[in-house]
Amino acid sequence: MANRFAVILAAGQGTRMKSKLHKMLHPVAGRPMVQHVVDQLQQVNLNKIVTIVGFGAEKVKAQLGSSSEFAFQKEQLGTGHAVLQAEDLLKDEKGVTVVACGDTPLIRAETFEELIQYHKKTGAKASILTTKVENPTGYGRVVRNDQDEVERIVEHKDANEGERLIQEINTGTYCFDNQALFAALKEVSNDNAQGEYYLPDVIKILRHQGDTVSAFMTPDFDETIGINDRIALAEAEKIMKKRINEQHMRNGVSIIDPEQTYIEPDVQIESDVILHPGTVLKGETIIRTGAEIGPHSELKDCEVGEDTVIRHSVATSSKVGNRVNIGPYAHIRPESRVGNDTKVGNFVEIKKTNLGDHSKVSHLSYIGDADVGERVNVGCGTITVNYDGTNKYLTTIEDDAFIGCNSNLIAPVTVGKGSYVAAGSTITKNVPENALSIARARQTNKEEYASKFKK
């Protein structure tokens, strides 16, 4: 197989985004758009990827890391000039080079592969990825001759009235013979309305030399859209969301309302999971079979076990076991482990806590920096007081303990196995196994005293 290379154009300023964040780093489905392009290209067995950077170069390089080499475009003088910056890294290589834009995150690896194969099949020096659109305003037009061969690409601003009627457009993605590409780039001029060096002019140069130029048309216009402003960003987000959701549904996941369900690309969901409207699944979340998520729940970097139900709740960087019932309005904060057959009820916050199997924290409690054993019942209003203003401390509640309502456990403290904490207690010392601990003032009743306040 011939050597394969890629050049990704990511040097532009992206002023229409009106953002402090570099355009290429704006996320689509939770992942920077340029990262999507790199990820898809990596699937077509490339020998090298070169990303052209300019504005925000260091941030783009930090995002892509070792997945790409980089060339710097000091002045933004057009797409042809941008590709030319990769000359030192690629000029001596033999093979094919894919040129793609960093703001086209929806192009699939399969389409890149089809373009390369079509390029090889036609024996072309250059192949263009094209598509048809009803309103081609703003796009470069693909001009063909009477034999239906590609003659040139003309940018919208440079197109005459007849050329502007053409509906076949240049998507900005190409496949070139590598050495032919860099030879032709040196002949490109900036004699055009923008005063820039256009990459599409390479097509005209190669045709004048008698070289074959082919065009591979994708029927999916949505796949080719470039993102230049927030409107296009939202459209790309919508398309990517639909693509991801439909793939999960084909794999046996029930999504009640796909338009109201957001799933990022790295999320794994097993079959027979039900996702209700308002579900947001981010990062490397894993949902096991039979689980039911939502409505209105957000999980990030979590693992959720089989047959677990989570409603109206938020969980981050935590592991939830099998047959767990969470919510409504629970918050599972990072580094928590919720065991099997447990309950985390309404208005409960758990942080950096291990909650053992068959234990319950049913309502209105904060359990932070705690190790809770099995079969523990934590009553309503229980607080683990874990912070003294400087340091965090551990609360340990051993197996089969019972914590009464409205109790404060002042860490560091241990509640022993099988022990009881009476409702309303503030516990400052360890509670022995099987003991009853009461730490509250004795009740005093003053007869008829209330009548004094009514006078």
Curated annotation (Swiss-Prot):
Gene3D superfamilies: Hexapeptide repeat proteins, Spore Coat Polysaccharide Biosynthesis Protein SpsA, Chain A
Cofactor(s) annotated in UniProt: Mg(2+)
Residues that, per the record, bind UDP-N-acetyl-alpha-D-glucosamine: 9-12, 23, 73, 78-79, 140, 155, 170, 228, 333, 351, 366, 377
InterPro entries from the UniProt entry: Bifunctional_GlmU, GlmU-like, GlmU_C_LbH, Hexapep, Hexapep_transf_CS, NTP_transferase_dom, Nucleotide-diphossugar_trans, Trimer_LpxA-like_sf
Family: In the N-terminal section; belongs to the N-acetylglucosamine-1-phosphate uridyltransferase family.
Functional note: Catalyzes the last two sequential reactions in the de novo biosynthetic pathway for UDP-N-acetylglucosamine (UDP-GlcNAc). The C-terminal domain catalyzes the transfer of acetyl group from acetyl coenzyme A to glucosamine-1-phosphate (GlcN-1-P) to produce N-acetylglucosamine-1-phosphate (GlcNAc-1-P), which is converted into UDP-GlcNAc by the transfer of uridine 5-monophosphate (from uridine 5-triphosphate), a reaction catalyzed by the N-terminal domain.
Assembly and binders: Homotrimer.
Stated name of the protein: Bifunctional protein GlmU
